[in-house]
Amino acid sequence: MIPLMHDFEGETVLVVGGGPVGARKARTFATEASVVVLSPEFADRAFADAEKVRAAPDPEDAEEWVERTDPALVVAATDDSALNDAFTAVAEEHGALVNRADDHGDQSFGNVVVPATVRDDPVTLAIATGGRAPALSKHLRERFEDEFGNAGLMAELVGDLREDLRDRGVPPAERRDAVRLVVRSREVWKALDSGRYKGEQVARDVIGELPGDQT
């Protein structure tokens, strides 16, 4: 599989199954998409802003539900393999993406894998092991969160810094070098623990005087 970011803004995701896995999938996609969760019962978990539809579809009902919701993605997250098979087949016939929550990495049972994800806007990190080592995905995600907890702040700082250096007439090569110095600086990362302003101050010190600065 090839990693790919997909914009679900304005689209619908149909989650079939209201257990803990279905709830987790609903929370993931509800950050952008309109999510419909179809299940005869729902786990005592948060489903974010998803619409919960209480129904017990049979495999023969998959066509009707996919046509009714017109999803960009179908998540098959029940413990009934026949039901998951039916929704997978119908979704593929309708050109929708498919994520099989009861399968790990086999494209014949779905063409989408939802990786372990870290979000610190505007930074998004996704980690996948093809279903072979979920514990490793979780470990790597937690390690990133611990070591780069200010990734979002760093991205904002560096983005503004690039614009500032460009406006000041600093040549492209020097701009790239300056940005590399900042993102590799332990001092800047540590300073961001005290907020954006402190991080900017230390970043300026790290960069120092740059050739081509016309200010």
Where are these regions (language model features)?
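Conserved acidic residues
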Residues: 55-57
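An accessory alpha-helical subdomain
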Residues: 129-215
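ADP-ribose/adenylate-binding Rossmann-like module
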Residues: 73-80, 84-112
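E1/E1-like adenylate-forming module used to activate ubiquitin-like modifiers
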Residues: 100-152
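Hydrophobic, well-ordered beta-alpha structural blocks that scaffold small-molecule cofactor pockets
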Residues: 1-41, 45-48
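Structural motif
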Residues: 12, 72-73
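Short amphipathic alpha-helix with an adjacent loop that forms part of the alpha/beta core around
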Residues: 59-69
